[in-house]
Amino acid sequence: MEIKQLVLNKAKEAKESSRFIAKASTDLKNKIIVRMADYLKQNKDELIKANRIDVENAQKKGISKALIDRLTLTEKRIDEMIKGLQEVVALPDPVGEITKMWLRPNGMQVGKMRVPIGVIGVIYEARPNVTVDVTGLCLKAGNSVVLRGGSEAINSNIALVKILKEALKDEGMHEGVVTYIDISQREAVLEMIKLEGIIDLIIPRGGEGLIRTVTENSRIPVLKHYKGVCHVFVDRDADLAMAEEICFNAKVQRPATCNAMETMLVDENIAKKFLPNMLKKFEDAGVELKGCLKTKKIYPKVKDVKEEDFYQEYLDLVLNVKVVKNIDEAIEHITKYGSAHSDSIVTKDYNKAMKFLKEVDSSAVFVNASTRLNDGYQFGLGAEIGISTDKIHARGPMGLEELTCTKFIVFGNGQIRQ
């Protein structure tokens, strides 16, 4: 069977199953997710065995250590997936929630109710944990899901989906609620994103290349972030000890994440006082430093920064450093080079803090806090499917609520249009 038909069949299976999960009770959805967690626990050895095949294949192909690390499943990582499902069970179910209700002059009551989106297509790369994470979230929000993982993780994902489907079946739910496109060719992605009317929303999770391909070719609405080019601006009125701690955390704690700082901006009035200790601390942590001319005068060890570097999402221990005249120049820099993801100011000046919050147009803007905190759990929203830099439907961490939409509901007692 050709790829086009195979992808269509999988998507139709998800579409047909979506009405059953959409009307499922919270209790049933939670039971399914609990069973998924139990089955993962019972099948750890099988999962690690399947994953080992993917890891060995990746090593033979010379794939980078960073990618192999993301690909690898360990007992600890499976436990984290199980914990993630358990946390989804504990979250309130948004489906059926009436968010507004108002009375019209004719006595008619009009309201808005949260309902599932329907069928969500998730396209991702070499991270098998995404298979479980997004399934739990989509299912709890009453959606069926069409998964297409990276070819590097195909054996791991097939093993995971088999377990997830068994849990659905054993709780009496249609197995088509979770479908996996086990076709490694890129054509499968291009066919999947054409299926308007069957798949309702596409969420790509991966590198900039994948997200750009999906966005430029999809006939279905796409919820995404291209990349995280995040900034911390250290204002002249900053608490410098606090600034040092925030900047170090934003870069070093987990540099491969989308909310890690890529450029540090420093007000020229405090640059000579702040930069020597800060940059030495980064250097000791193994951070490669690239700086502007003013930075080099203060700390000659830094490499020259090029303009194209300011657009880069390094996802590594590499940092751009720029000395700016004031808050206005900092905001101009962020506006030009940033990706509208996560940006922070460190300052004791309330007016500057409010100016930064108002003028920096990102999914999350921070005052005196690390960009690494742009996260569903950190915000108290629970598990997330990703962080959106879009402005339509969802922006910032996308949790259960963002995997629903609303419909109008109307209560009348005989009203007609005059």
UniProtKB/Swiss-Prot annotation:
Location(s), subcellular: Cytoplasm
Single Gene Ontology MF annotation: glutamate-5-semialdehyde dehydrogenase activity
Uppermost EC category: oxidoreductase
InterPro entries: Ald_DH/histidinol_DH (IPR016161), Ald_DH_C (IPR016163), Ald_DH_N (IPR016162), Aldehyde_DH_dom (IPR015590), G-glutamylP_reductase_CS (IPR020593), Glu-5-SA_DH (IPR012134), GPR_dom (IPR000965)
GO aspect biological process, one term: L-proline biosynthetic process
GO-annotated cellular components: cytoplasm
Pathway: Amino-acid biosynthesis; L-proline biosynthesis; L-glutamate 5-semialdehyde from L-glutamate: step 2/2
Keywords: Amino-acid biosynthesis, Cytoplasm, NADP, Oxidoreductase, Proline biosynthesis
EC number: 1.2.1.41
UniProt cross-references to Pfam families, sorted A to Z: Aldedh
Catalyzed reactions per annotation: L-glutamate 5-semialdehyde + phosphate + NADP(+) = L-glutamyl 5-phosphate + NADPH + H(+)
Role played: Catalyzes the NADPH-dependent reduction of L-glutamate 5-phosphate into L-glutamate 5-semialdehyde and phosphate. The product spontaneously undergoes cyclization to form 1-pyrroline-5-carboxylate.
PANTHER family: DELTA-1-PYRROLINE-5-CARBOXYLATE SYNTHASE (PTHR11063:SF8), GLUTAMATE SEMIALDEHYDE DEHYDROGENASE (PTHR11063)
Family membership noted in the UniProt record: Belongs to the gamma-glutamyl phosphate reductase family.
Protein name: Gamma-glutamyl phosphate reductase
Natural source organism: Thermodesulfovibrio yellowstonii (strain ATCC 51303 / DSM 11347 / YP87)
Taxonomic path: Bacteria, Pseudomonadati, Nitrospirota, Thermodesulfovibrionia, Thermodesulfovibrionales
